[in-house]
Structures are given as structure tokens and as C-alpha cells.
From Swiss-Prot:
Keywords: Cytoplasm, GTP-binding, Hydrolase, Metal-binding, Nucleotide-binding, Ribosome biogenesis, RNA-binding, rRNA-binding, Zinc. PANTHER family: SMALL RIBOSOMAL SUBUNIT BIOGENESIS GTPASE RSGA (PTHR32120), SMALL RIBOSOMAL SUBUNIT BIOGENESIS GTPASE RSGA 1, MITOCHONDRIAL-RELATED (PTHR32120:SF11). Pfam families: RsgA_GTPase, RsgA_N. The lineage of its organism: Bacteria, Pseudomonadati, Bacteroidota, Flavobacteriia, Flavobacteriales. It is an enzyme of class 3 (hydrolase). Zn(2+) binds at C265, C270, H272, C278. This is Small ribosomal subunit biogenesis GTPase RsgA. One of several proteins that assist in the late maturation steps of the functional core of the 30S ribosomal subunit. Helps release RbfA from mature subunits. May play a role in the assembly of ribosomal proteins into the subunit. Circularly permuted GTPase that catalyzes slow GTP hydrolysis, GTPase activity is stimulated by the 30S ribosomal subunit. Belongs to the TRAFAC class YlqF/YawG GTPase family. RsgA subfamily. Signal peptide: none annotated. Monomer. Associates with 30S ribosomal subunit, binds 16S rRNA.
Length: 325
């Protein structure tokens, strides 16, 4: 029998059969997919073959084959830094929910997510959520960020889940597709899904006034069928996005605005740091590339995993003289 993994709890997997039935399955033995060393060999979105267990009183099954994935998206495992965690597979697009405040989403987090999506060939779209809560300063920050990413070529949406602003536009973009939602805890993923599909009644959280951080309401990634011919994968909130190892010379290729210029650099292996006649540095000095993007690039290049949750939005407009050297 063949089905799609809709939920993974680590040891059990909820599989939807081709007939539309849901079966709780376990994994048979150990899987290794094309040498991928991951903490979770089976991910939400996987197409699997399974057999029903004849000895069980309940309807359960055993997964014995994983079909080839058309794509998947990963990040570094939280506890095992040398391994990867597959967030989801066989997805058409990923939406990253961004909030300016309550909780704040840093540019380094956004850029690490976008670089990973670029590396795995998945379209990424930014959703600026909670626009109804913005004041004059945070609205300025939000519009500035949106300008940066729109200029690069990323689609951006402004949404208020609580006031139902922009939700219909989002639904139009999701029709006929499998979409993954990601972001920090508290950015409003579950609230947004409830706004699109109230019958799901997903649990939502309250932001801590002291830490400005959200509490986890989604424990495991889970796929849902929506009434408007769309499927969504809701993922647990994440604090940081660890980049899986990339070759230094590859990284700039996952920044679209860098990729357009890199052939103009004097050296083919230019890392866009101290090399002479670097097209990226020249564009940076002309403010044709955002300083926040360049700083994110440097942090990834230098393997700065300890501080990838730092930075904030004003660094382009007030870049220090030291940064510009």
C-alpha cells in the first residue's frame, strides 16, 4: 500500500492512504536515504509504501519503502550539530512568517532560511504577519525589510490574521499546492492557519511580555488538507536556523543579488571579502546590496553558528564605519 506521511512524532508516523484513510505506522528497521545522515529518516510529505500489521488489534502499519523525494528542506539538528533534520519533503513552496516585534524576527534568521530554500530549489515567500500591531517605527522597519527582499526578487505578503487582511491573497497562492509554513514560535502560524481554515482549531499561544518570545504550540510537523484544494505543513516554531555545511565558494550563489554579479568579480573563487575588484563589494558601497544581507553572508561564510540570532533591521541605514572598511 502507498500513502503520504502527514505527521511524524519520531517513532510513529500518520500516513494517509491513496483511499483517504489514516493509518498509524512504524518504521521497519533503519533507513538511509542516499547517504543522508538525518535525525529523522522519514519526514512529513514523504511518499511511502507500507503494510498493515496483521497481529495488531488496532489498524497499524509498517513502513518499508520511501519513494524518491522531488525535494526536501533541512536544517542542522538542534542536539546533534553534525546531523541534519529534514523539516519536510515534496513541497511546492515555503512561507516564512516574519514579525517585526512580538516576537522580533532577525534578518540573519530570514537570510539563513532563504539561503537554505535556494540551496534546495524550493520557492520561498515572506509573510509579514501582525501588521495590525505595528506602530510608526515598526511599520517603517517592516516596509524597509519588505523593500529589501522585494528588490531581490522575493514575493512578500503583508497579513493580519486577526483582522483577516491579506488572507484571501495567500489562499489564492496556495491552491493546488503543498505549502510549508515556518517561523519563530509566536509569529502566528497557527493563528493564520485557523484564519484560513477555522474548522482546524489549531492551538495558539500568547507572547511572553518579558522575553517577547512565543511558546511552542506545534510540537511536531503536521500536514493538513484544506477545503480550498490546498495542503499545508505546519511546523514547530524554531529559534535559530542552522545552515547545513556548504562549500565557501557556493554560498554566494544562494544570494540571488550576489549571483547576478559574481561573474564580474576579477577572481572566479572570490569570496567577496578582501579580494580586489570584487563586484559584490562595489555594489555594497553603492548601496545596491543591503548591508544586512552582506553581514548575513559573512556570518554563514565564517560558520558563525553561535550568533546567528543577532542583528536587527536598522543596520543598513546606520552601518558603522568599521563595517564599511
Amino acid at each position: 500500500m502507498t500513502g503520504t506521511v502527514y505527521k511524524s512524532t519520531g517513532s510513529w508516523y500518520t500516513v494517509k492512504s491513496e483511499k483517504g484513510d489514516f493509518v498509524e505506522c512504524r518504521m521497519k528497521g533503519k533507513f538511509r536515504i542516499k547517504g543522508i545522515k538525518s535525525t529523522n529518516p522519514i519526514a512529513v510529505g514523504d511518499i511511502v509504501d507500507y503494510e498493515l500489521d496483521e497481529t495488531s488489534d488496532a489498524v497499524t502499519g509498517t513502513i518499508h519503502t520511501i519513494h524518491e523525494r522531488k525535494n526536501y528542506i533541512v536544517r542542522k539538528s538542534v542536539n546533534l550539530s553534525k546531523q541534519i533534520h529534514i523539516i519536510a519533503s515534496n513541497i511546492d513552496q515555503v512561507f516564512l512568517l516574519v514579525t517585526i516585534d512580538n516576537p522580533p524576527t532577525t534578518t540573519s534568521f530570514i537570510d539563513r532560511f532563504l539561503v537554505t530554500a535556494e540551496a534546495y530549489g524550493i520557492e520561498a515567500i515572506l509573510i509579514f504577519n501582525k501588521i495590525d500591531t505595528l506602530n510608526e517605527q515598526t511599520l517603517d522597519d517592516q516596509l524597509y525589510l519588505q523593500h529589501i527582499y522585494t528588490e531581490i526578487g522575493y514575493k512578500c505578503l503583508r497579513i493580519s490574521s486577526t483582522e483577516n487582511k491579506g488572507v484571501d491573497k495567500l489562499k489564492e497562492m496556495m491552491v493546488g499546492k503543498v505549502s510549508m509554513f515556518s517561523g519563530h514560535s509566536g509569529v502566528g502560524k497557527s493563528t493564520l492557519v485557523n484564519a484560513m481554515e477555522p474548522s482546524l482549531h489549531l492551538k495558539t499561544s500568547v507572547i511572553s511580555e518579558q522575553s517577547k518570545q512565543g511558546q511552542h504550540t506545534t510540537t511536531f510537523a503536521e500536514m493538513y488538507d484544506l477545503s480550498f484544494d490546498a495542503r499545508i505543513i505546519d511546523t514547530p516554531g524554531i529559534k535559530g536556523f542552522g545552515i547545513v555545511d556548504m562549500e565557501p565558494t557556493e554560498i554566494s550563489g544562494y544570494f540571488p543579488e550576489f549571483f547576478k554579479l559574481k561573474d564580474q568579480c576579477k577572481f572566479n573563487n572570490c569570496l567577496h571579502k578582501e579580494e580586489p575588484h570584487c563586484a559584490i563589494k562595489a555594489a555594497l558601497e553603492k548601496d545596491e546590496i543591503a548591508w544586512s544581507r552582506y553581514n548575513s553572508y559573512l556570518k554563514i561564510l565564517e560558520g558563525d553558528e553561535e550568533h546567528y540570532r543577532t542583528d536587527i533591521y536598522g543596520e543598513d541605514r546606520a552601518a558603522s564605519d568599521e563595517t564599511r572598511k
